[in-house]
């Protein structure tokens, strides 16, 4: 079972809790253990501040993943970590890339969850594995390949 804490630190429209949960559970289903995580939905100012603090980049990015660094045996429920998603960036990217807002939200939540599970896209081989899994999961939701018409990775972090 997933214990999901959803924090809305913005007045902008955001997906419903049920949708966020569905996308997380889909991405995390390979993990058999109970898990706990947080999704914080932020405005551009907070997104920029966090990206600057943790990545030394002076702009808001779409999703930041903060995997927990606590041994599972020390917790009642294993803590996966936190996702911080900048609502304005998600909306802007979806419009610029001609994607539905729901498909882009689903992609970024799944992408962030995979980071919490240890997936990465720094090396080409790792990126191919991660993107392949993202495509598969999004197809299950009926969403198109997020990388199909994109010569560059749409994930900006």
From Swiss-Prot:
Residues 136-157 are annotated as: Disordered. Its EC number is 3.1.-.-. One of its GO terms (molecular function) is zinc ion binding. GO terms for cellular component: cytoplasm. It comes from the Bacteria. Belongs to the endoribonuclease YbeY family. Single strand-specific metallo-endoribonuclease involved in late-stage 70S ribosome quality control and in maturation of the 3' terminus of the 16S rRNA. This is Endoribonuclease YbeY. The lineage of its organism: Bacteria, Pseudomonadati, Pseudomonadota, Gammaproteobacteria, Pseudomonadales.
């Amino acid at each position: 079972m997933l214990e999901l804490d959803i924090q809305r630190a913005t007045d902008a429209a955001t997906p419903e809790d049920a949708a966020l949960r569905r996308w997380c559970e889909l991405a995390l289903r390979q993990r058999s253990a109970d898990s706990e995580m947080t999704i914080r939905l932020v405005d551009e100012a907070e997104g920029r501040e966090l990206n600057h603090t943790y990545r030394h980049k002076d702009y808001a990015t779409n999703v930041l993943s903060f995997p927990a660094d606590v041994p599972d045996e020390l917790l009642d429920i294993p803590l996966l970590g936190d996702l911080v998603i900048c609502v304005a960036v998600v909306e802007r990217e979806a419009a610029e890339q001609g994607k539905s807002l729901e498909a882009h939200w689903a992609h970024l939540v799944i992408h962030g969850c995979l980071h919490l599970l240890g997936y990465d896209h720094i090396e080409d081989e790792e990126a191919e594995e991660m993107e392949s899994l993202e495509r598969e999961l999004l197809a299950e939701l009926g969403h198109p390949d997020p990388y199909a018409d994109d010569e560059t990775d749409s994930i900006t972090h």
